[in-house]
């Protein structure tokens, strides 16, 4: 049993690197199965968001370099380049890292709640792929419980702050009166839903949701009195949009420089504020070169986020202590589980010996032996048989110089200090 958490995030890698290491939802099942097959991993899960791509693995013998090499090969990356941005956590540290991530303690926005849902999705996909077994499954459940405790017992989640909130905060800085602004949201996932909620609460004049499928866009639009359109309608909507915020799972850019340039001409160069939260990016970086365009990537949100963190810093220490306690408790319980099979086999052996001696006793009673004699023989026979194998093994180990076995036997059988010394003294006298 050995746990491994390996990956990159917003603190170790730029958006250029992160978008090259990201997994699309369509890739995950096949990638997980390949990961287990090619790296000798017994269980695995992949968490891939705009801010991080992480692999959670259970192996008999840890081989982080093999896993890192697989990740580089899968995404056609130079191994040394990937290694420069990657981090590796093993066993206790891996457990603690997973719990910190799920609790929002390792997020770009401290305490942001979306990461827990993303972690649950990673677990669900791994179950679908058949790459989660009993050990990683227990770890995920313990991780979810730890994150829930942090949310319930600390103020880490108060004063809602998220990447979505940061994007809207930037929009407020550029457009003093959002009630006169029109917004185009590209995508219909969790982040865009949060953006739509924030914009709606601020009274934005008109919100349009563009998505690959009109059905998904319509479901989201109905919640906030918005309009739903297809991705093909984006060029027309750009002309009317003061704010554009995009977050899809597309592997290719959705908005190019030419389309935005055309929209600006029709807008008579009225400014457009754009935030690209997606990884890989939805908006070509060259769009930012245009006059009258304010383009921000997810990495540009750091300053806004820093301001919003202040209210949560006080709760962070208490949350860290809860996570550490949760990780320690999980590892203790997991190590206890390692003894279950041995204890089960030992109990079965004891019950077999008991049944053998009991059968002998019953035969003696049937043949007329006194109950007292039978009980004495039963007790003696059971004692001798139960002690035979441990006695033989203990003598063998000490004869081989394994004196640590004596201390282990004293602890295992609760014999108390000096038991072995007193018996040795008697034999020497």
UniProtKB/Swiss-Prot annotation:
EC top class named in words: oxidoreductase
One GO process term, biological-process aspect: protoporphyrinogen IX biosynthetic process from glutamate
Catalytic residues, chain numbering: 50 (nucleophile)
Residues binding substrate, per UniProt: 49-52, 107, 112-114, 118
Annotated catalysed reactions: (S)-4-amino-5-oxopentanoate + tRNA(Glu) + NADP(+) = L-glutamyl-tRNA(Glu) + NADPH + H(+)
Gene Ontology terms, MF aspect: glutamyl-tRNA reductase activity; NADP binding
Protein family membership: Belongs to the glutamyl-tRNA reductase family.
Subunit composition and interactions: Homodimer.
Free-text note regarding domains: Possesses an unusual extended V-shaped dimeric structure with each monomer consisting of three distinct domains arranged along a curved 'spinal' alpha-helix. The N-terminal catalytic domain specifically recognizes the glutamate moiety of the substrate. The second domain is the NADPH-binding domain, and the third C-terminal domain is responsible for dimerization.
PANTHER family: GLUTAMYL-TRNA REDUCTASE
Name by which UniProt lists this protein: Glutamyl-tRNA reductase
Taxonomic lineage from the root: Bacteria, Pseudomonadati, Pseudomonadota, Gammaproteobacteria, Pseudomonadales
């Amino acid at each position: 049993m050995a746990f491994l958490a390996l990956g990159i995030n917003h603190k170790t890698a730029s958006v250029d690197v992160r978008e090259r290491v990201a997994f699309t939802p369509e890739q995950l099942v096949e990638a997980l199965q390949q990961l287990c097959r090619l790296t000798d991993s017994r269980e695995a899960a992949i968490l891939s968001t705009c801010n991080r791509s992480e692999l959670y693995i259970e192996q008999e013998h840890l081989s982080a370099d093999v896993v890192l090499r697989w990740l580089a090969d899968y995404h056609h990356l130079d191994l040394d380049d990937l290694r420069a941005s990657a981090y590796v956590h093993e066993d206790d540290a891996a457990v603690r890292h997973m719990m910190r991530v799920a609790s929002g303690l390792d997020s770009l926005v401290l305490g942001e709640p979306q990461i827990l849902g993303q972690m649950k999705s990673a677990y669900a996909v791994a179950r679908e792929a058949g790459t989660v077994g009993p050990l990683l499954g227990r770890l995920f459940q313990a991780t979810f419980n730890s994150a829930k405790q942090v949310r319930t017992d600390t103020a880490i989640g108060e004063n809602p702050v998220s990447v979505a909130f940061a994007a809207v905060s930037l929009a407020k800085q550029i457009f003093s009166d959002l009630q006169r602004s029109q917004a185009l949201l590209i995508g219909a996932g969790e982040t865009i839903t949060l953006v739509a909620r924030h914009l709606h609460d601020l009274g934005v004049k008109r919100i349009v949701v563009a998505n690959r499928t009109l059905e998904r866009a319509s479901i989201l639009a109905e919640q906030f009195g918005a309009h739903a359109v297809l991705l093909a309608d984006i060029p027309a909507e750009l002309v009317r949009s003061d704010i554009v915020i995009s977050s899809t799972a597309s592997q290719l850019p959705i908005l190019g420089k030419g389309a935005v340039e055309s929209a600006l001409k029709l807008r008579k160069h009225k400014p457009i504020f754009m935030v690209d939260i997606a990884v890989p990016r939805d908006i070509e970086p060259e769009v930012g070169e245009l006059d009258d365009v304010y383009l921000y990537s997810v990495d540009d949100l750091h300053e806004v986020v820093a301001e919003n963190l202040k209210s949560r810093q006080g709760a962070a220490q208490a949350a860290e202590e809860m996570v550490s306690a949760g990780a320690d408790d999980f590892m203790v319980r997991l190590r206890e589980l390692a003894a279950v099979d041995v204890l089960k086999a030992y109990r079965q052996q004891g019950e077999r010996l008991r049944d053998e001696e009991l059968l002998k006793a019953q035969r003696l009673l049937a043949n007329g032996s006194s109950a007292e004699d039978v009980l004495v023989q039963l007790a003696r026979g059971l004692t001798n048989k139960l002690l035979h194998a441990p006695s033989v093994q203990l003598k063998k180990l000490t004869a081989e110089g394994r004196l640590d076995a004596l201390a282990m036997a004293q602890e295992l059988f609760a014999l108390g200090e000096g038991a072995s010394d007193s018996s040795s003294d008697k034999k020497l006298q």
